[in-house]
């Protein structure tokens, strides 16, 4: 979950995303109840569903315009009842390009979500909630990259050809684009955005788990910035390269015997609630 690496360490990202969930199953499995119990006044709650609400499985399926909309209304109303601030997102695009009569892929993407894209926007307008058009953001990104290069964003590994779920690179890029759009609409969070070319994090919220891995993989040409997030790492690798600027969060400790450093106090929380593993969360 890459969102934490896009924000300062004043923001706690509490990720409640669960793969394969719809608004219906998220509620029925008591996942929403657990989020609601944790919300404090001033928390931001990011809500994005749709991919799994589309499925025919009766445990998952909802209808746009009726049950899907009603569940989104529930999330908004109950978040506000706890003093939280809901933010609605629609579904990111699937990497599905049109084929022409010659069997060749064009640069046009097929809409696989239909009216499920409209419900979050409709409820946001109805309830006066911030809406982030993740479908447009990711549509523009994938279309610009084209049929071949866009595979670099998704889980194309070996024989696996997954055009729905992002890999680490894709998740980092999409999270960065998403939080930039959030920052435009929510100035309080916009002030907390940080921009680095690469992030190292022990909890999987970055591009690499270790600084050593990052230094091995980063291209040598050009300048770049690297953020090392709070956590305990092995011995700090020797490093001399004036073109690479490394920033360490408070709470970074080096050396296999180093004790965990105490994490700094946070005063912003962000909670994410999502029905697939690409995006998810809750917040303060």
Which ranges hold each PLM region?
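Short, flexible loop segments at the rims of nucleotide/cofactor-binding pockets, characterized by
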Residues: 21-25, 107-109, 202-205
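Active-site-proximal beta-strand/loop segments in catalytic clefts of secreted hydrolases
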Residues: 15-21, 47-52, 89-93, 133-137, ...
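Short aromatic-glycine-(Arg/Gly/Cys) micro-motifs in beta-strand/loop hairpins
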Residues: 195-201
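Alpha-helical cap/lid subdomain in secreted, periplasmic
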Residues: 30-168, 172, 176-190
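N-terminal post-signal-peptidase region of extra-cytosolic proteins
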Residues: 23-34, 209
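N-terminal extracellular ligand-recognition/capping segment immediately after the signal peptide
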Residues: 203-213, 222-253
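Serine-esterase "nucleophile elbow" of acetyl-processing enzymes
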Residues: 1-17, 33-41, 254-284
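N-terminal, post-signal-peptide region of Sec/Tat-exported proteins
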Residues: 1-25, 218-232, 236-240
């Amino acid at each position: 979950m890459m969102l934490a690496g896009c924000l300062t360490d004043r923001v706690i990202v509490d990720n409640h995303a669960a793969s394969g969930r719809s608004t219906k199953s998220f509620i029925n499995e008591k996942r929403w109840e657990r989020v609601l119990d944790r919300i404090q006044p001033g928390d931001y709650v990011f809500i994005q569903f749709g991919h799994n609400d589309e499925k025919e499985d009766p445990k998952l399926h909802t209808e746009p315009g009726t049950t899907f909309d009603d569940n989104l209304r529930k999330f908004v109303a109950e978040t506000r009842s706890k003093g939280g601030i809901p933010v609605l997102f629609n579904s990111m695009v699937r990497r599905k390009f049109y084929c022409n009569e010659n069997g060749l892929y064009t640069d046009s993407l097929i809409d696989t979500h239909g009216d499920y894209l409209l419900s979050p926007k409709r409820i946001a307008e109805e309830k006066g909630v911030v809406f982030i058009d993740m479908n447009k953001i990711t549509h523009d990104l994938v279309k610009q990259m084209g049929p071949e290069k866009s595979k670099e964003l998704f889980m194309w590994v070996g024989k696996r050809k997954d055009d729905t779920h992002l890999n680490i690179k894709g998740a980092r890029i999409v999270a960065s684009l998403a939080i930039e759009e959030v920052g435009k609409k929510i100035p309080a969070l916009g002030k907390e955005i940080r921009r680095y070319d690469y992030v190292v994090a022990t909890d999987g919220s970055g591009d690499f788990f270790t600084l050593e891995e990052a230094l091995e993989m980063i291209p040598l040409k050009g300048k770049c910035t690297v953020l090392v997030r709070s956590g305990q790492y092995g011995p700090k690798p020797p490093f001399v390269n004036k073109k690479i600027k490394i920033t360490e969060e408070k709470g970074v400790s080096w050396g296999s015997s180093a004790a965990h450093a105490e994490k700094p106090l946070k005063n912003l929380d962000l909670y994410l609630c999502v029905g697939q593993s690409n995006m998810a969360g809750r917040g303060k």
